[in-house]
Structures are given as structure tokens and as C-alpha cells.
A protein has these predicted regions:
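Alpha-helical cap/lid subdomain in secreted, periplasmic
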Residues: 1-119, 123, 127-141
């Protein structure tokens, strides 16, 4: 949204219409944030959006994730943590339960709202973020 609360581009991404203008504007804004936060040779770890149990919401979130992933791919110092893949079922769709990498047991990872992660899901996500940090430290010569 703009400062005056108006929408920069009037479109609902993922709704089936032409979202080219929306994607372009969102990419511009996401890229600017990435460049700002990742400046001065800093590594930015960007955590993606998980899918939702509502297919309409998921369609919109997928568009956002696609744009963010494309912008991250243009920037070697941006690491994208893919929550979509981590918290999806075998078919790539919404999953309430996923395999916990700590013990390989399938567990409930979602809050009751069908989107947010519960404590177990947050712990699994924290493992992925920690791994991204370790990988970056190793790339910088750290003994991790």
C-alpha cells in the first residue's frame, strides 16, 4: 500500500486475472528491501510464506512467494528459506502434518487458523533458519 492507504496496483494476485503489473510493483518493492537489508556485504535470510488451508489464500501467497524467490535468486547474498516446501504435503499442497526432521515422526505443525505454525512447526522452521545461518558462516570461513 501507498502512504495514503491506496493500493499501488489494483489487483488481487493469484485471482486468475493478469497480475503482471502487481508482480512488477511487488518485485520492485521486495528487491528494494532486499538491497537495503543486504547492503554492506550483509547476508539476508528471507523466510518465505507457507501455504494456507484456504485455496484462494494459497493462490495469492504462491504469487508472493514466486516473486520473492525470483528476486532472491538475483542476489547472491540473499538466502531464501522455503517454508512452502517444508510445510507442504507430498503433492505440494497444504499439510497439517509433516515429518519432523529431528525424529522422522509425522507431527501436527499448524495452528488452528490453518496458516500459522504451532510450536512444533516453529521449532522445525527454526532448524531450517539455523541451517541457513550455519551454511553462511561456513561460506565465510567460520568453524561451525
Amino acid at each position: 500500500r501507498n502512504i495514503d492507504k491506496s493500493w499501488a496496483v489494483q489487483h488481487n494476485p493469484g485471482s486468475g486475472g493478469d497480475d503482471t503489473d502487481w508482480r512488477t510493483e511487488y518485485a520492485k518493492r521486495v528487491g528494494a528491501v532486499m538491497d537495503y537489508l543486504g547492503g554492506d556485504n550483509r547476508t539476508l535470510i528471507w523466510v518465505g510464506i507457507p501455504n494456507d488451508d484456504n485455496p484462494d489464500v494459497t493462490a495469492r501467497l504462491q504469487v508472493q512467494n514466486e516473486v520473492v524467490m525470483a528476486e532472491a535468486a538475483k542476489r547472491p547474498k540473499v538466502v531464501f528459506v522455503d517454508t512452502w516446501r517444508r510445510f507442504s504435503g507430498l503433492s505440494g499442497g497444504f499439510a497439517e502434518y509433516v515429518q519432523d526432521p529431528r525424529d522422522n515422526v509425522v507431527k501436527d505443525v499448524r495452528a488452528d487458523d490453518g496458516f500459522h505454525l504451532n510450536e512444533t512447526g516453529a521449532e522445525i522452521l527454526a532448524l531450517d533458519i539455523a541451517q541457513a545461518i550455519r551454511n553462511e558462516l561456513r561460506a565465510r570461513g567460520g568453524a561451525v
